[in-house]
Regions:
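Glycine-rich beta-strand-centered segment in the early N-terminal region that forms part
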Residues: 31-47, 55-107
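Glycine/charged-rich beta-loop-alpha catalytic/anionic-binding loops adjacent to active sites
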Residues: 118-129
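Nucleotide donor/acceptor-binding cores
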Residues: 12, 101, 153-154
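Short glycine/threonine/proline-enriched tight-turn/helix- or strand-capping micro-motif at secondary-structure
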Residues: 21-29
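Short structural boundary motif marking the start of a folded domain
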Residues: 8-14
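Residue-level recognition of beta-strand termini and adjacent short loop/turns
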Residues: 18-21, 34
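Mid-domain Rossmann-like dinucleotide-binding core that forms the NAD(H)/NADP(H) cofactor-binding site
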Residues: 131-176
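A structural motif shared across PLP-dependent enzymes of the aminotransferase-like
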Residues: 104-117
Length: 176
């Protein structure tokens, strides 16, 4: 009779910053999801050129380590660590209402992962998974506009044509 020890180990491949300026892929065993957890198979993962560039180059100031920590980061700055916060995937295991759903999660770059079920956000109908990875950047753009507090009819100049700058411009163009 098979025992739980006979169950094959599920492996994930994760991107680790092994040392400042050097990334590597590592195989990691996944824990079985608990009753309030999901196992997600990643479809897309976005790299934040600005933030993750700072992390890769070891340029995160020690005073900012706490604020720069990603929700499911493993390891500590400057390295070794597993970093990232823009993953879209499909729930493979977990509560029936989430199984098979495409979801967004603030998770590092990894092929599969287990997180609390309330850490994933199901994608709205019609939102392509490849675009949904921009959710973290869109949140930054929304916060920038909230902080700027534009009024009706204000002219807004966006300096910077990166992903966040383009999203700020896109949102600003839709303001009254």
């Amino acid at each position: 009779m098979p025992s739980i020890a006979d169950k094959p180990t599920v492996l994930a491949r994760a991107c680790w910053l092994a040392a400042v300026g050097r990334a590597e892929l590592r195989d990691e065993p996944l824990p079985a999801p608990g009753p309030d957890e999901v196992q997600v198979r990643a479809l897309h993962s976005a790299v934040s050129r600005g933030t993750e560039g700072l992390v890769f180059r070891g340029e995160v100031p020690a005073s900012e380590y706490g604020r720069m920590r990603a929700p499911f980061q493993t390891g500590d700055f400057p390295a070794p660590l597993k970093y990232g916060y823009a993953s879209v995937g499909v729930v493979e295991l977990g509560p029936p209402a989430l199984r098979g759903r495409e979801v967004f999660c603030l998770h590092p770059h990894q092929t599969r992962y287990v997180v609390p079920a309330d850490a994933v956000l199901p994608l709205p109908p019609g939102v392509p998974a490849a675009r949904a990875v921009l959710a973290a950047n869109l949140e930054t753009a929304v916060n920038a506009l909230w902080d700027a507090r534009p009024g009706v009819g204000d002219r807004i100049a966006v300096v910077g044509g990166g992903v966040v700058g383009l999203l700020v411009a896109w949102l600003a163009a839709r303001l009254p």
